[in-house]
Design a protein with these regions (language model features):
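Compositionally biased terminal segments of proteins
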Residues: 1-148
Length: 148
């Protein structure tokens, strides 16, 4: 399993933020098995066109992406200690690409797009070389990184 959303951003950014969901990806052939395992563990699942969302007993939900965009993320994932738990998270560049994709979706709620923009800014602040990956539109909305 690979974490690619806010959990990955919190790993790569210097200042972590709270998240209410864990976004993850598995190999395409493992989706049905993953859904079964989580349902057996007590999670309720709901399938959508691009994801399977899970809700358990806590306020934190899980979102399994089934979108082709994320298919190669696991091959570039890195091991990371996230709050004392060893996880595989999306590479730094893939984390940014995922956030840019989410921010670019016009049907997303404004509050989510603003959070995506903040996540993009946090990543660029922590890793200035990522500035070159931003679109011109994003460069107008995110401050350039400080030169050191």
């Amino acid at each position: 399993n690979l974490r690619y959303g806010a959990v990955a951003v919190n790993h790569w950014a210097q200042q972590p933020m709270v998240t209410q969901d864990v976004d993850f990806v598995v190999a395409a052939e493992a989706v049905d098995r993953t859904v079964s395992l989580l349902e057996e563990a007590g999670f309720h699942s709901e399938r959508f066109e691009w994801s399977v969302n899970f809700k358990g007993c806590s306020a934190v939900s899980l979102q399994l992406s089934t979108e082709d965009f994320y298919r190669d993320f696991p091959s570039r994932a890195v091991a990371a200690d996230v709050h004392g738990i060893l996880l595989r998270v999306a590479s730094l560049e893939d984390t940014l690409k995922g956030k840019i994709k989410a921010w670019s979706e016009p049907e997303r709620r404004q509050s989510k797009r603003l959070k995506d923009l903040a996540d993009i800014a946090r990543l660029v602040e922590s890793h200035p070389h990522l500035w070159n990956m931003l679109t011109d539109n994003l460069k107008q909305q995110v401050q350039p990184p400080e030169k050191t």
